[in-house]
UniProtKB/Swiss-Prot annotation:
One of its GO terms (molecular function) is ATP binding. InterPro entries: AAA+_ATPase, ABC_transporter-like_ATP-bd, ABC_transporter-like_CS, ABC_transporter_ATP-bind, P-loop_NTPase. The gene is tauB. Pfam families: ABC_tran. Residues 4-233 form the ABC transporter domain. NCBIfam families: PRK11248.1. Its main location: membrane. This is Taurine import ATP-binding protein TauB. Keywords: ATP-binding, Cell inner membrane, Cell membrane, Membrane, Nucleotide-binding, Translocase, Transport. It comes from Pseudomonas fluorescens (strain ATCC BAA-477 / NRRL B-23932 / Pf-5).
Amino acid sequence: MALLQLERISAQYPGAAEPVLADISLTLGPQQLLVALGPSGSGKTSLLNLIAGFVEPSAGRIQLDGVPVQGPSAERGVVFQDDALLPWQDVLGNVAFGLELAGVARDKREARAREMLALVDLAGFDKRRIWQLSGGQKQRVGLARALAADPRVLLMDEPFGALDAFTREQMQELLLQVWRRTAKPVFLITHDIEEAVFLATDLILLAPNPGQIVERLNLDFGQRYAAGESARAIKSDPRFIETREHVLARVFSQRSATQQQERP
């Protein structure tokens, strides 16, 4: 049964001649890791902003468990590419910040924050300052903070895009471990093709001008990793390589088509 439903969503910004998204329908169910991939201008971030409630669609409707999405909510936790951490707070304070705003008692919110830090392999980092953390550690703190409020859905906006290749792979593997342990549905957007194929249970490919879904793929590579298979074995699997090349070809064909349309 779908937890999150988007029905024929379109989005057009004020003053824009064309919509950024047109006629998008999708569902996100329990234990699903849905990844949106597409070239620049395909509306990936706009789609996530709609689901998060940061902006409203110009047409269609979005529902979470049958209730219309109207504005941001703790039920939809968001992890950004920019870690957006509070430099005046230590690690524990950052993870517990949303719970503090919600009025949760100090002992309970700090216990929950420590639990989430352990989940992302940062046990013992409570008193570290943000400036003392690496890029990957900052993203772990951001993930722990989003999970601390126990959201129904986790939304991730190119969360590993600013990391080096080695740290990015570590974070991908950590995400799959967290996803398996929490069983929370995840909606993630990325521009990295290998990342999309590795993580997704369901992959949607978006074409630009306006953003539309042009292909949907059901994949199991991330599930295989979560079940204990090594990332190296999965990524050397001929089926993984074939899928990655197929997706690469589709993305480049969309980019080429867009460039031809933009030529005078």
